[in-house]
Regions:
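Bacterial N-terminal signal peptides
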Residues: 9-16
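Exposed acidic/polar residues on beta-strands and adjacent loops within beta-sheet cores, strongest
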Residues: 22-172
């Protein structure tokens, strides 16, 4: 095989692996996150938010609100409107969230202590779920049942950084 063919094959394999990793969460995972309970094969587990840590100088001067999930730090990082979710020591910017909706919604900030935090496992996939109702206000009026959600796909050991998804849904 010549060098050009090897390069093309390597590139195709890389793209296929990246696409598989960044696959959107299933409907069961999204529903488990919104409803706060297991759905189908998506196993939902709450993250205790009654024990909160904070760090006013987290990685590059971010202010962090931290919880523990599976022995690891998870949470919310704030700095000059460049907020993000935390997994271990990695900050995943909200603005990089992949939309779950069409047309896509603009990722929204939220107050971490007012949100519901959980983990969801489906097969070999694991997610951190953050479900929030726009700081207790909903969208307004008849839209009080509208919630925002972030699902952060947790990479398997030794893999790339987490992938973040964002959506807005109505809770029934």
């Amino acid at each position: 095989m010549n060098v050009c063919k090897r390069l093309i094959v390597a590139l195709l394999v890389t793209v296929m692996m990246a696409s598989a990793y960044a696959a959107k969460p299933s409907a069961e995972v999204v529903n488990a996150c919104l409803q706060g309970e297991s759905r189908g094969r998506a196993i939902w587990t709450t993250i205790a938010t009654n024990e909160v840590g904070s760090d006013d100088d987290f990685r590059g001067g971010y202010k962090a609100t931290l919880f523990t999930a599976d022995g690891r730090d998870v949470g919310y990082a704030e700095k000059d409107g460049r907020d993000g979710l935390i997994w271990r020591r990695t900050i995943v910017p909200l603005r990089r969230a992949v939309p779950l909706d069409h047309p896509p919604e603009t990722p929204s900030t939220f107050t971490p202590l007012l949100a519901d935090w959980s983990t969801i496992k489906q097969g070999s996939q694991r997610f951190i779920c953050v479900n929030f109702n726009f700081d207790g206000l909903g969208r307004s009026g008849s839209f009080q049942k509208i919630h925002g959600l972030y699902l952060m796909g947790i990479p398997q050991r030794g893999k790339a950084t987490p992938v973040l998804f964002y959506g807005v849904r109505r809770i029934e």
